[in-house]
Structure formats: structure tokens, C-alpha cells
UniProtKB/Swiss-Prot annotation:
Pfam families noted in UniProt: JmjC, WRC, zf-4CXXC_R1
Name of the protein in question: E3 ubiquitin-protein ligase JMJ24
Chain's gene name: JMJ24
GO cellular component terms attached to this protein's record: Ino80 complex; nucleus; Set1C/COMPASS complex
Post-translation changes: Self-ubiquitinates.
Source organism: Arabidopsis thaliana (Mouse-ear cress)
Predominant place of localization: nucleus
Spans annotated as Disordered: 20-40, 77-103, 685-715
């Protein structure tokens, strides 16, 4: 049983009422003393293990009385504080488990977790990278990526879980306790109950070990001092208090009377470290979004994920119908018993299973539904009475695995059942695989039904097409007869007035967006490699600290991996020259900082950094209302999901052997890259002197030439100059610079904001391709970088996933022969680049720079992400793209569940009725009617 916060509060309230009633009637005092007449099964089970046992009545739904329950929680909190006091700064998981959406912990959507996970006495907390050691069930194939797990449980306090009291305490904490926030920085949500917060095991004052000191109004929330003369407590949250000195110095515009009603923290104005690390400001900002806007966000999200969950439901229905026909009886599908940090993958394609799958009870071989469909098609098996083509998307060719090549002896049975593969293929050869499931039987069907009811009852107005002559749009391409040469490029200040409407419209059409002046020069100065290393080093264990450590780096001149000292790399980052040869040292750090260290550094040392990002509704990893990927519960494994820091050396001087570059990336996630630091602190004129790029014959590469990465080609001297040179600049007129028509500038004289040029030197050059150009681009790469015929692969190979790089000759050839031209522009310090999912891009580092990247998933990108998931499924199993695949099916299910409950909460809540009715009465009426219909209508079986 998992007890959540609300149920616990209700139990405490009921218990207090019962205790008062018993005291009034003379039954007992509730303090563990004599209470005669209580049945043994209702008594508190607290004892000394010998003779004594507490005689008080146990709490409702608990095995102990209120006194011993609170004592146990305080003991666990103090134990957790002592155990983690020295290591709190090293926790890589920051933030709170609670999000704005309360729909992420459905009782019917949780995976089945066996209590055997805890029944070994003490919860084993292995200190491998600060993560709880995963125990794998041999009967299930688990997904074990090479990258560190980003979502996982933190090590728990050692509690004897065979004891009823210990089990109650641990399961109580599992229901609400943060898995990301270290004890030293956690701040509870102000909307939570005060009595519950006062004994929270995750909250304590920095000035005292008393976890409830601040909630009692003894300590100033801002300065953490309790020796102030006047401290004003907040009546809204009953938790925080501010001293008069801090209020007059930081919040002088708020009167003391207003502070007493609503404190700065509840207003989202507090800038202390605790509030920044707990995203309190962002929570308040999201909470204050108008209800109608929230509903529109949720409808957009539901409309985007509905096709995906309907596809999942249709595939499940087909398999259920087949299973009923094979068994000729009503079926009750076996549900897999997965632990919270486990993931089941298909034995063939290695893709995580969403819900239904086929399982061998003898050898535990697992097969996803898509592989079942591919095997039946390869075996030419026709299943009568079912819709076999539900997986086909209109207008898109179906991608499937080549089973006949990889498993020539494995075929589907004539009745449509799937036999277990022979032993040489990893199976046991049994006659049939049984249908099994992970979630509850009707969960997906209910989601589809409710989502359709809501979406069909609402219609959002179409966005107006923006004026491309607006000064906020910059010309990044010279395509003929094309309306998307201009890119939306506002400044951060402009976004505050424009809102997200224009961004939404651009994103829906798959166009990139750039945002200028996200960070100022003073903020960027704190992002140099030495400062990053110093801050990360402060979070590491003293025993593991190293003054000048070795780092892994890629030498862009030859593509080889080298070990360099931090000091040596820092010198190369600043001046970039080899003192012996005089050539630039073009190094890119590899996996430094690590994903976990990057997340820890950004959320702990730079808590204000995320808050400075634009479009937080889209990109925030936990609180973004429009970030579909943020709807996953915290216990789900999702790889490669944290912020990443990329440190590279670059130079404006062109090198004949190569350049500092990043090959073509083709992501199923939306990405944002923020250039936080460059080695050039002064403005200078860009001069790049290069030899003319020699003309290359227009012909295919030799059939014996393999598909090499740019680094490998550099090693063999096969790749020509990879950056813009004088010859190419003269030929490609006009230059693709950031320019706008002066006539379109705003009349207020704000030319600095509206101009697309920048006085500082560009740190990186970007080439971003449109989604509609992907087929032509893929064809060109397949023709130019062709694999030899003697190399065969088990699955489909896509050149866009191979990290190739297009130099100026390739881009010119691509434009002349295929009519494909990317958006080409320079990124300046403090500028953010938003790349939609499915838009290939490549980067050339024009000088040493540091990029911070965040991934997210907008509703407008869900369809493209689902399409790319099908492509990635057909890649070889050891391909990097497959190891980092986004579980778009599972994400869509959880997002739909979360959105449905949020809509119900907003629409049916009486306090929002007036606001919704005043804004749009028809919208409110339609949604309420559809929700009532969905609630009253009896839920049918998922596939009948």
C-alpha cells in the first residue's frame, strides 16, 4: 500500500478527532498510557520486544498510535539529516517530486511493485554514483544504458521493514518525499499542510537541526537568522517568516501588512538559495497562469498525444482479439511485476515495452507488439477478423525489421500465434508466446475515451500568421520561392511582451527559433572552464578531489581521443595554440562534465540559470505545462534527459586539416542550446584566411569507401575545409549573415534589440535543415557517403544518424542538385537556439565556447517524435541513437492521464467557475458536459 500526502493528513485529522472524543469520555489520553477495553488488534504495536507494549489505540490505517508515529518520523528525519549532512551538496538529484500537475501518481497506472524489494531487513543503499543499486530480475530483460540513470530513488535511511512501524514510515515517505532534493536545500510547497511540514524528513533550517524551526516563525527565511528583533510570519503558508531588515532591504515595495498576508516566497519573489533550488519562483509563476490559458495548454497537449495513445490502443485490441480466438475463453492477462527503477525491453529490437507484449513462461523471452506484427508479415500470415493495418500511418511508409535475414528459421504460426524462437536465437522453441501486460487492463482504453471526450468538445482558434517583415524575424536562408527564409529571433525582453503565441506558431510549423540576450555579459563571465571545475569540485567528495585532473578530449585535427590535464585544456581554451607547432589546439571535452555532474552543478550552483530561460512553459524539466516529457513520474527511467554542458576549443583561423565541429544531429527531442561563454571577450573583425576549396568531381564515392565520420576522414586527410572561407564566401553571395531590412526596424529607436547582427564575435556557426528537406538530405548522404556492398547490416541504416558533416562543397552541391539549403547563422554569446525535433543540424565552433543544452518535448513535436521512434527502432541494437531513444508511447500515456485530471480539476472546481464563465461560457459548458458524460458512461473492457 502506498500512502500519499492527502490520505495521511486525513488520517491525522480523523485521529485527532477520535482522541478528543475518547479524552472527553474518559477512555484514555492518547499518550501511550492505559486505555482499557481496546481490542488487541486495534492497539498500538509499539513494544520493547519483550513484555511492554503500548496500550494506546492505533491510528486509522496505521499500526501505531499517533505519538509513536510522530516519534518515528522525527527519528527518521534526524537520522536522515545526520547521515546526509556532509554529503548533501553531492546529491545530483535536486528539486521536488511534486509538480504542478497532480496527475502523475495514479493508483491504476503504477507498475506493480513487490514488497520483496524491501523484505531483506535493511534497504540496501549502494553508493554507486549516489544511486540506489538496481536489482535485476533474471526473468526479465532490462534496459541498461551506458549513461548514468537520471531518474532514480535516492538511498533511504536504514529502517527495519519487517517491523510494522518501519514499514509504515517508509511507505509514508515514499508517497510524498522528494527524490531529488538534498536535505540542506529543500523547501516544502507553501500549499501543503503546516502540521505535516513541521515533521517533514526533508526540511530543516540551515541554522538549526530542528526540522520545524522555520515553520514556528523563529528564523528568518531569507537570512536564516533568529536573533532579529522583529520577525513577521506569513499567514498564507503558515511556514515562512521574514525579518524586518530583509524586508526593508530586499522587498521594500511590499508593506509589512501585505507581507503578513502573503510573504515574498508565496508571491514567487524570494531569491534565496532555497527558493531558487526548489523552483519556488517558477511554481508561483505557473500557479498564477490564468485558468483559461491552462486549459488551452492542456487541450493542446491532449490533442497532440491522442493519436499516439489511440495507436497503442488499436494495437492492443488486435492482440487481445487474437488471444481470445486462440484460447477460446475469456482471458486475464498476466501482469508483469516490475520494480520502480526497472524497464522491460523487447529481446529483438531492444526497445522498451510500453504496455502489452508477448512473453514465454518457460524461458522469459519477451517480444513487443511491433515485432509480432513484423514477424507475421515476414511469414505471410493473415489474421482474419482483425485489422492488421492499424499500425500503418496514412501517407507514410511502414518501417519494419528484416526478420527473414536475422531469424531465417523463425516464423509465425498459421493461426497468428508467435512461437518462442529456437535456442540459437535466444528462445526455447515453445509453441506460443502468451500475451501479458504492464499496466492495468483498462487504463489505456479509459485514457482514449476521456481524451476523445475532452478534445471533441473543444476547439482552439487558429493562430494568425506572423508578418515576416517584422523586425523580430531575421533572414537566415536564400531559398527561392520559400516563405520560411526568415526565423523568429526576438530578445528576452521582447518575449515578455509577446508571450508564447509566436513561438507556438513557429514551432507548429517546425521552424527553429533564436532568442537573443538571454544572459548578459556579467552572467556569462561565470561560465569559464575554471569556474565550472571549481564549483563542481566543491560538490565532490574531498577524498576524490584532484587539483589538476586528466580529462578525456577529442582532438579535432585527427579525430583521436586524448588525455589532457585540466590546466592544459584551459590554456588551449584561452589562446588555442600549440607552442611547438603554432597550430591551434582544437579539443572537445568528452563526457565532461558528466550528465549527473552537469545536473548537480546547474541546479545547485546555478539555481537561477533555469529561471532565466525563455519559454519555461515548454522547457522546464519538471514544471513545464507544455513539456510532454515532464509528465513522466519520477520513478520512470528515461535516459539522456538532464542538462548537458559542452566545452569546445575553436578558432576563426581556418585549418587545412580540419575544424572544431559537431556532426549532423538528428534528434527525436526538441533541443535548446544556450551559448554561455566564449573565449573572446572583446569585439574584433572576423577574418578567416583559407586556401580555396578545390572542386571535387560530381560523382559517387568509391564503392569500397566506408561510411566514415568526419574525425576518421580528417585522420586520413580525406575531408577538405569544413568552414566558410573566402572562396566560398565570394561564390555564395550574398553572405548568410544575420540581417534585416532597415525599413522594418521599429520606430522607437531600439535598433540594438531589433537588429539581427551583433557587435561581438560569433561563437558558433549553425546549419539547421527543415523537416521537409530530410528525405532529400538523406538521399544525398546515402549517395555521397555510401556504404560498400560487402557490408551488410541486420536492420535499416540511416545516414542521418551517423554523425556526418557537410562542408561548403557538400552544401553547395546539395543546394544546386537537390534544392536543399539550411538556415545558416552565427550564434553569439548569451543567445539561445531552439531546434524542433526532426530538424537535422550541425555546428562549427568559430572560437572556444561552452554550450548548455536542455531537451524537452512540445505537443507540436509529439507526432514527429513518434515517427522518428519507428526509424530508430530499425537501427542496429548497438546504435547510440537506440540506446538513447525517447519512450514516446509511455510519455504520451502519462501525459494524457495528467492532462485529463488537470482539466477535471480546473473545470469542476467551483472557485474557477466564475473565471471560466466570464471568459468563455461555451467552452466551460462544453467541457463540463463532456466530462459528465465520460464520468456517467460505464467503462467497457479495453478491447470489446
Amino acid at each position: 500500500m502506498q500512502v500519499n500526502f492527502d490520505e495521511t493528513c486525513d488520517s491525522v485529522i480523523r485521529m485527532n478527532a477520535n482522541e478528543q472524543t475518547r479524552s472527553a469520555n474518559g477512555i484514555g489520553n492518547g499518550n501511550g498510557e492505559s486505555i482499557p477495553g481496546i481490542p488487541d488488534d486495534l492497539r498500538c504495536k509499539r513494544s520493547d520486544g519483550k513484555q511492554w507494549r503500548c496500550t494506546a489505540m492505533s491510528m486509522a490505517d496505521k499500526t501505531v498510535c499517533e505519538k509513536h508515529y510522530i516519534q518515528a518520523k522525527k527519528r527518521a528525519a534526524n537520522s536522515a539529516f545526520r547521515a546526509n549532512q556532509k554529503k548533501a551538496k553531492r546529491r545530483s538529484s535536486l528539486g521536488e517530486t511534486d509538480t504542478y500537475s497532480e496527475g502523475k501518481m495514479d493508483d491504476f497506472e503504477l507498475p506493480v511493485t513487490s514488497i520483496d524489494h524491501y523484505n531483506n531487513g535493511l534497504a540496501s543503499a549502494s553508493k554507486s554514483n549516489g544511486r540506489l543499486e538496481k536489482r535485476h530480475n533474471k526473468s526479465l530483460m532490462r534496459y541498461s544504458p551506458e549513461t548514468p540513470m537520471m531518474r532514480s530513488f535516492s538511498p533511504r535511511v536504514a529502517v527495519d521493514l519487517n517491523d510494522d512501524l518501519g514499514r509504515d514510515v517508509v511507505m509514508f515517505e515514499e508517497g510524498y518525499r522528494s527524490y531529488r532534493t538534498p536535505p540542506s536545500v529543500a523547501v516544502m510547497d507553501p500549499t501543503r499542510n503546516r502540521s505535516h511540514q513541521s515533521t517533514s524528513p526533508m526540511e530543516y533550517s540551515a541554522a538549526s537541526t530542528d526540522v520545524s524551526a522555520e515553520s514556528l516563525g523563529e528564523i528568518c527565511h531569507q537570512c536564516q537568522r533568529k536573533d532579529r528583533e522583529r520577525i513577521i510570519s506569513c499567514l498564507k503558508c503558515n511556514q515562512r517568516a521574514f525579518c524586518h531588515n530583509c524586508l526593508s532591504a530586499r522587498y521594500s515595495e511590499i508593506s509589512l501588512e501585505e507581507v503578513e498576508k502573503v510573504c515574498p516566497a508565496c508571491r514567487g519573489l524570494c531569491d534565496c538559495k532555497s527558493c531558487l533550488r526548489s523552483d519556488n519562483t517558477i511554481k508561483v509563476r505557473i500557479r498564477e497562469i490564468p485558468v483559461l490559458d491552462k486549459l488551452q495548454y492542456l487541450y493542446r497537449l491532449l490533442s497532440a498525444v491522442l493519436p499516439v495513445i489511440k495507436q497503442i490502443h488499436l494495437e492492443q485490441c488486435m492482440e487481445v482479439e487474437l488471444e481470445k480466438r486462440l484460447r477460446e475463453v475469456e482471458i486475464d492477462l498476466v501482469r508483469a511485476r516490475l520494480k520502480a527503477d526497472e524497464q522491460m525491453c523487447c529481446n529483438v529490437c531492444r526497445i522498451p515495452v510500453v504496455d502489452y507484449y508477448r512473453h514465454c513462461p518457460n524461458c522469459s523471452y519477451d517480444l513487443c507488439l511491433r515485432c509480432c506484427q513484423d514477424l507475421r508479415e515476414e511469414s505471410s500470415v493473415t489474421i482474419s477478423g482483425t485489422n492488421q493495418n492499424v499500425q500503418d500511418r496514412k501517407g507514410a511508409p511502414k518501417l519494419k525489421l528484416n526478420f527473414s535475414y536475422k531469424f531465417p528459421e523463425w516464423e509465425a504460426n498459421g493461426d497468428g500465434s508467435i512461437p518462442c524462437p529456437p535456442k540459437e536465437y535466444g528462445g526455447c522453441g515453445s509453441h506460443s508466446l502468451n500475451l501479458a501486460r504492464i499496466f492495468k487492463m483498462n487504463w489505456v482504453a479509459k485514457l482514449v475515451k476521456n481524451a476523445e471526450e475532452i478534445v471533441s468538445g473543444c476547439k482552439l482558434s487558429d493562430l494568425l500568421n506572423p508578418d515576416m517583415c517584422d523586425s523580430r524575424f531575421c533572414k537566415f536562408a536564400e531559398r527561392e520561392e520559400s516563405g520560411d527564409n526568415y526565423v523568429y529571433s526576438p530578445s528576452l525582453e521582447t518575449i515578455k511582451t509577446d508571450g508564447v503565441a509566436k513561438f507556438e506558431q513557429q514551432w507548429a510549423e517546425g521552424r527553429l527559433v533564436t532568442v537573443k540576450m538571454v544572459l548578459d555579459d556579467s552572467s556569462c563571465s561565470r561560465w569559464d572552464p575554471e569556474t565550472i571545475w571549481r564549483d563542481i569540485d566543491e560538490l565532490s567528495d574531498e577524498k576524490l578531489r584532484e587539483h589538476d585532473p586528466f580529462l578525456k578530449a577529442i582532438n579535432c585535427l585527427d579525430g583521436l581521443e586524448v588525455d589532457v590535464r585540466l590546466g592544459e585544456f584551459t590554456r588551449a581554451y584561452k589562446d588555442g595554440k600549440n607552442q611547438e607547432t603554432g597550430l591551434p589546439l582544437l579539443w572537445k571535452l568528452k563526457d565532461w562534465p558528466s550528465p549527473s555532474a552537469s545536473e548537480e552543478f546547474i541546479f545547485y550552483q546555478r539555481p537561477e540559470f533555469i529561471r532565466s530561460f525563455p519559454f519555461l512553459e515548454y522547457i522546464h524539466p519538471r514544471l513545464g505545462l507544455l513539456n510532454v516529457a515532464a509528465k513522466l513520474p519520477h520513478y520512470s527511467l528515461q535516459n539522456d534527459s538532464g542538462p548537458k554542458i559542452y566545452v569546445s576549443c575553436g578558432t576563426y583561423q581556418e585549418i587545412s586539416a580540419g575544424d572544431s565541429l559537431t556532426g549532423i544531429h538528428y534528434n527525436m527531442r526538441d533541443m535548446v542550446y544556450l551559448l554561455v561563454h566564449t573565449s573572446e571577450e572583446t569585439t574584433f573583425e572576423r577574418v578567416r584566411k583559407t586556401k580555396p576549396v578545390p572542386e571535387e568531381p560530381d560523382q559517387k564515392m568509391s564503392e569500397n569507401e566506408s561510411l566514415l565520420s568526419p574525425e576518421q576522414k580528417l585522420r586520413d586527410g580525406e575531408l577538405h575545409d569544413l568552414s566558410l572561407g573566402e572562396a566560398s564566401m565570394e561564390k555564395n553571395e550574398p553572405e548568410l549573415a544575420l540581417t534585416v531590412n532597415p525599413e522594418n526596424l521599429t520606430e522607437n529607436g531600439d535598433n540594438m534589440e531589433s537588429s539581427c547582427t551583433s557587435s561581438c564575435a560569433g561563437g558558433a556557426q549553425w546549419d539547421v535543415f527543415r523537416r521537409q528537406d530530410v528525405p532529400k538530405l538523406s538521399g544525398y548522404l546515402q549517395r555521397t557517403f555510401q556504404k560498400p556492398d560487402n557490408i551488410q547490416t541486420d536492420f535499416v541504416s540511416r545516414p542521418l544518424y551517423e554523425g556526418l558533416f557537410l562542408n561548403e562543397h557538400h552544401k553547395r552541391q546539395l543546394r544546386d542538385e537537390f534544392g536543399v539549403e539550411p538556415w545558416t547563422f552565427e550564434q553569439h554569446r548569451g543567445e539561445a537556439i531552439f531546434i524542433p525535433a526532426g530538424c537535422p543540424f550541425q555546428i562549427t565552433n568559430l572560437q572556444s565556447n561552452i554550450q548548455v543544452a536542455l531537451d524537452f518535448l512540445c505537443p507540436e513535436s509529439v507526432g514527429e517524435s513518434a515517427r522518428l521512434a519507428e526509424e530508430i527502432r530499425c537501427l542496429p541494437n548497438d546504435h547510440e541513437a537506440k540506446l538513447q531513444i525517447l519512450e514516446i508511447g509511455k510519455i504520451s500515456l502519462y501525459a494524457a492521464s495528467s492532462a485529463i485530471k488537470e482539466v477535471q480539476k480546473l473545470v469542476l472546481d467551483p472557485k474557477f467557475g466564475a473565471e471560466l464563465g466570464f471568459e468563455d461560457s461555451n467552452l466551460t459548458k462544453a467541457v463540463s458536459h463532456n466530462l459528465d458524460e465520460a464520468t456517467k458512461r460505464p467503462q467497457q473492457n479495453s478491447c470489446t
